[in-house]
Structures are given as C-alpha cells and as structure tokens.
C-alpha cells in the first residue's frame, strides 16, 4: 500500500488551541483530523481561551505513541535510586527543588511529591522527556533514576519504574489522532486501521524510537477510554 506524504506543522500553544477549535467545528466526515499530544487534554484547564471540551467535542481515532519521561537529578546529589532520593527529601523538607519545561513535567513533579509525601519546591523553567534528557545522562551531566511509565520502557529497559517505589505513579506524554465529535463508526474504524498499519511497520517503529517515542497500536474504543481516564 502506498501512502501520500503529508506535511505536519509544529505550532505554538495558541495556534494548537485554534486548530483544535477548528477541528471541533469541522464536518465529521473524516477529512479534517487533529494530531495532538497529551497537552490537548490539559490545555482547557490551563488556558481560558481554549473553549473546547476534549471529551465532548472530539472523536478519538488512534493513539499512536507514548513519550516516557525520566526522573533525573544532578550527579552530586547522593542518591542512586528513587527510594534514596525520597529519604533525602524527607530528612530535609524544603531543601530540594524540581524543575520543569512542560505541563507534563509539572504534573510529574507534583504527583511525585504527593504520592511520596515529601516537600519539594517547584522551579518553573528533574522530570524530562527521554530524547531531551538521554544525551545529558550519557554525558554524565545528569543521573537517571527511573522512568515515569507504569511498565518498564522498551527504550530504557535498565531503568526501574517510578511505580516500583512510589505506588500509583504512571505519567507519560502521548500522541494521537482525533476527529470532530459524532464521526460515523465505519469512518473511525477505517481511519484507525490505516493508521495502525503504518504505525506497526518496522521502519516507522525505528524512526519513532529514534525520537524517544514508543509506538502504540490500539482500537478507537481503547483510545477513548484512555482519554477519559486522563
């Protein structure tokens, strides 16, 4: 099967919100789709101008990949595991801070502090996505302690999960396809099948892995349940 190449644009938050709104208003015929990340779900809670409901205004079609995060610390911090880091933070409440470069990193740090029962200062700018953090870990500028996904990452099988120490911790960034609300089931099913066929190709899997993303293949129903759980 030959697929026509399409150009995808990475856009600022404001433009992403505008495009989500445009897709929500489009005809549910399968010709206008939104490719987005997990920020799509949280944006309405962060930006008053979002004006869309990620559940009611869209039809989930396919979840295509997960982007795991790592818990990383400065090499000088005397901790080599999540448990040791928690012990340090409990011993000296308020001493340790965590930085973030995205909404997912903010949520990761806040969830860690809540579940572990420790006091951490948030410094907006610890949790970082794999492709951004891995070069620094390999250069020994950062120390990686764990991945944030509930299951071990296929990209970093040597790293333990946060959940192994902090039960209930499961955070990942993801990407997927959505259409307007009320799309016909047969159209959703066909689009899902076409997308999955591409995602499951070995060459596409390899390209996603190079970007630090784990390919994901599932049904529209599974994606719908996943989005509602977010």
Where are these regions (language model features)?
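A generic structural signal for short hydrophobic patches within well-formed alpha-helices
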Residues: 133, 152, 162, 204-205, ...
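Active-site pre-lysine segment of PLP-dependent enzymes
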Residues: 1, 17-22, 45
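Short helix-initiation/N-cap motifs at beta->coil->alpha
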Residues: 11-19, 67, 80, 103-104, ...
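Paired acidic/hydrophobic, glycine-rich loop segments that form the ligand-binding mouth/hinge
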Residues: 30-36, 99, 124-128, 143-146
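Extracellular/periplasmic bilobal clamshell ligand-binding domains
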Residues: 219-230
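Short beta-strand-to-loop elements that line the ligand-binding cleft
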Residues: 6-14, 59-60, 98-100, 120-128, ...
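A ligand-binding cleft/hinge motif common to bilobed small-molecule-binding domains
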Residues: 39-49, 106, 110-115, 127-158
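Hinge/capping helix and adjacent helix->loop/strand transition within the periplasmic-binding protein
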Residues: 25-30, 45-123, 162, 167, ...
